[in-house]
Protein backbone atom coordinates (compact mmCIF):
# COMPACT_ATOMS: atom_id res chain seq x y z
CA UNK A 1 0.00 0.00 0.00
CA UNK A 2 1.26 3.45 -0.91
CA UNK A 3 -0.09 6.46 0.96
CA UNK A 4 -1.14 9.79 -0.57
CA UNK A 5 2.38 11.20 -0.17
CA UNK A 6 3.99 8.36 -2.13
CA UNK A 7 5.32 6.35 0.81
CA UNK A 8 4.90 2.58 0.94
CA UNK A 9 3.45 1.43 4.27
CA UNK A 10 5.93 -0.94 5.81
CA UNK A 11 7.10 -2.61 9.02
CA UNK A 12 10.65 -2.80 10.35
CA UNK A 13 11.71 -5.57 12.74
CA UNK A 14 14.46 -5.48 15.38
CA UNK A 15 15.02 -8.90 16.98
CA UNK A 16 17.03 -8.87 20.21
CA UNK A 17 18.64 -11.80 21.99
CA UNK A 18 19.35 -12.16 25.73
CA UNK A 19 22.81 -10.63 25.29
CA UNK A 20 21.51 -7.27 24.04
CA UNK A 21 22.55 -8.09 20.49
CA UNK A 22 20.35 -7.65 17.44
CA UNK A 23 19.68 -9.86 14.42
CA UNK A 24 21.46 -8.47 11.35
CA UNK A 25 20.65 -10.00 7.96
CA UNK A 26 22.61 -10.04 4.69
CA UNK A 27 20.50 -9.28 1.62
CA UNK A 28 20.33 -12.19 -0.81
CA UNK A 29 23.16 -12.11 -3.34
CA UNK A 30 24.39 -8.71 -2.16
CA UNK A 31 26.95 -7.26 0.22
CA UNK A 32 24.43 -5.09 2.08
CA UNK A 33 22.91 -5.85 5.47
CA UNK A 34 19.71 -4.70 7.14
CA UNK A 35 16.93 -5.52 9.58
CA UNK A 36 13.99 -7.55 8.27
CA UNK A 37 11.27 -5.30 6.85
CA UNK A 38 8.36 -5.52 4.46
CA UNK A 39 5.20 -3.98 3.13
CA UNK A 40 1.78 -3.90 4.74
CA UNK A 41 -0.86 -5.51 2.53
CA UNK A 42 -4.34 -4.08 2.02
CA UNK A 43 -6.53 -4.92 5.05
CA UNK A 44 -3.55 -5.96 7.19
CA UNK A 45 -2.62 -4.33 10.50
CA UNK A 46 1.04 -3.45 11.11
CA UNK A 47 1.26 -6.29 13.65
CA UNK A 48 -0.18 -8.82 11.19
CA UNK A 49 2.28 -7.62 8.53
CA UNK A 50 5.15 -7.90 11.00
CA UNK A 51 4.34 -11.55 11.80
CA UNK A 52 3.91 -12.38 8.10
CA UNK A 53 7.23 -10.74 7.18
CA UNK A 54 8.95 -12.34 10.18
CA UNK A 55 7.93 -15.76 8.90
CA UNK A 56 8.64 -15.08 5.22
CA UNK A 57 12.07 -13.51 5.80
CA UNK A 58 13.38 -15.16 8.98
CA UNK A 59 11.22 -18.28 9.41
CA UNK A 60 10.06 -17.33 12.91
CA UNK A 61 6.47 -17.48 14.15
CA UNK A 62 4.49 -15.67 16.83
CA UNK A 63 5.42 -18.32 19.41
CA UNK A 64 9.16 -17.78 18.73
CA UNK A 65 9.20 -14.10 19.74
CA UNK A 66 7.68 -11.60 22.14
CA UNK A 67 6.73 -8.06 21.11
CA UNK A 68 8.55 -5.75 23.53
CA UNK A 69 7.65 -2.43 21.89
CA UNK A 70 6.25 -0.73 18.82
CA UNK A 71 7.47 2.65 17.59
CA UNK A 72 5.27 5.52 18.76
CA UNK A 73 5.28 7.13 15.32
CA UNK A 74 5.63 6.12 11.71
CA UNK A 75 9.21 6.69 10.57
CA UNK A 76 9.90 7.64 6.95
CA UNK A 77 12.80 7.59 4.56
CA UNK A 78 13.02 8.65 0.94
CA UNK A 79 14.55 6.41 -1.68
CA UNK A 80 17.42 7.82 -3.71
CA UNK A 81 16.08 9.03 -7.08
CA UNK A 82 17.97 6.25 -8.88
CA UNK A 83 15.90 3.63 -6.97
CA UNK A 84 12.47 5.19 -7.57
CA UNK A 85 10.44 3.28 -10.18
CA UNK A 86 9.03 6.29 -12.00
CA UNK A 87 6.96 4.12 -14.37
CA UNK A 88 4.98 2.53 -11.49
CA UNK A 89 1.53 3.81 -10.60
CA UNK A 90 1.32 5.07 -7.96
CA UNK A 91 4.97 6.11 -7.71
CA UNK A 92 6.65 5.06 -4.46
CA UNK A 93 9.21 7.63 -3.29
CA UNK A 94 10.07 5.95 0.01
CA UNK A 95 8.97 3.87 2.97
CA UNK A 96 6.77 4.82 5.92
CA UNK A 97 7.52 2.32 8.65
CA UNK A 98 6.09 1.13 11.94
CA UNK A 99 8.94 -0.50 13.89
CA UNK A 100 8.75 -3.49 16.25
CA UNK A 101 11.24 -4.55 18.91
CA UNK A 102 11.03 -8.31 19.44
CA UNK A 103 12.74 -10.58 21.94
CA UNK A 104 13.78 -13.98 20.61
CA UNK A 105 12.06 -16.56 22.84
CA UNK A 106 13.28 -19.72 21.11
CA UNK A 107 16.55 -21.34 20.17
CA UNK A 108 18.22 -19.56 17.26
CA UNK A 109 18.12 -22.84 15.33
CA UNK A 110 14.48 -21.90 14.54
CA UNK A 111 15.79 -19.15 12.23
CA UNK A 112 15.30 -20.31 8.64
CA UNK A 113 15.53 -17.76 5.85
CA UNK A 114 14.36 -20.27 3.22
CA UNK A 115 10.67 -20.34 4.31
CA UNK A 116 9.46 -17.59 1.98
CA UNK A 117 8.87 -18.16 -1.73
CA UNK A 118 11.78 -15.86 -2.61
CA UNK A 119 14.51 -15.54 0.05
CA UNK A 120 15.29 -11.94 1.04
CA UNK A 121 18.45 -12.87 2.96
CA UNK A 122 21.23 -15.44 2.61
CA UNK A 123 23.09 -14.94 5.88
CA UNK A 124 22.76 -13.43 9.33
CA UNK A 125 24.63 -12.73 12.55
CA UNK A 126 24.16 -11.20 15.97
CA UNK A 127 25.71 -7.73 16.28
CA UNK A 128 26.02 -5.16 19.03
CA UNK A 129 22.93 -3.02 19.53
CA UNK A 130 24.17 0.18 17.85
CA UNK A 131 26.15 -1.51 15.04
CA UNK A 132 23.30 -1.36 12.44
CA UNK A 133 22.99 2.43 12.73
CA UNK A 134 26.53 2.83 11.38
CA UNK A 135 26.38 0.01 8.84
CA UNK A 136 23.01 0.25 7.10
CA UNK A 137 22.79 1.88 3.66
CA UNK A 138 22.97 5.67 4.10
CA UNK A 139 19.39 6.56 3.10
CA UNK A 140 17.98 4.33 5.91
CA UNK A 141 20.43 5.53 8.57
CA UNK A 142 18.26 8.25 10.16
CA UNK A 143 15.25 5.93 10.50
CA UNK A 144 17.43 3.22 12.05
CA UNK A 145 18.93 5.73 14.49
CA UNK A 146 15.48 6.97 15.54
CA UNK A 147 14.02 3.47 15.97
CA UNK A 148 17.06 2.19 17.88
CA UNK A 149 17.11 5.26 20.13
CA UNK A 150 13.43 4.76 20.96
CA UNK A 151 13.96 1.07 21.78
CA UNK A 152 17.35 1.33 23.54
CA UNK A 153 16.14 1.40 27.15
CA UNK A 154 13.87 -1.58 26.50
CA UNK A 155 16.44 -3.66 24.64
CA UNK A 156 19.29 -3.20 27.08
CA UNK A 157 17.71 -5.22 29.94
CA UNK A 158 18.07 -8.29 27.68
CA UNK A 159 21.81 -7.85 27.89
CA UNK A 160 23.35 -10.15 30.49
CA UNK A 161 27.07 -9.80 29.73
CA UNK A 162 29.15 -8.48 26.90
CA UNK A 163 30.08 -11.34 24.60
CA UNK A 164 33.73 -11.58 23.62
CA UNK A 165 34.87 -12.75 20.23
CA UNK A 166 34.14 -12.01 16.64
CA UNK A 167 30.74 -11.85 15.03
CA UNK A 168 30.03 -15.02 13.10
CA UNK A 169 28.14 -15.16 9.80
CA UNK A 170 25.46 -17.81 9.78
CA UNK A 171 23.81 -19.25 6.73
CA UNK A 172 20.11 -19.80 6.87
UniProtKB/Swiss-Prot annotation:
Family matches, as CDD domains: NUDIX_Ap4A_hydrolase_plant_like (cd03671)
GO CC, any one term: cytoplasm
Pfam families in the cross-refs: NUDIX
Domain of life from the UniProt record: Bacteria
EC code: 3.6.1.-
Names of required cofactors: a divalent metal cation
Enzyme class: hydrolase
Every Nudix hydrolase domain range: 6-149
MF (Gene Ontology): mRNA 5'-diphosphatase activity
Extent of motif Nudix box: 38-59
Keywords for this protein: Hydrolase
UniProt family annotation: Belongs to the Nudix hydrolase family. RppH subfamily.
Name by which UniProt lists this protein: RNA pyrophosphohydrolase
Encoding gene (name): rppH
Amino acid sequence: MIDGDGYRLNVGIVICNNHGQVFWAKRYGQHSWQFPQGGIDEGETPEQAMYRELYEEVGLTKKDVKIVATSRHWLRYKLPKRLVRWDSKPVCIGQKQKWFLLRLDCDESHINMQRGSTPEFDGWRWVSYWYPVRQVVSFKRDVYRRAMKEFASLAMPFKERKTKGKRKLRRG
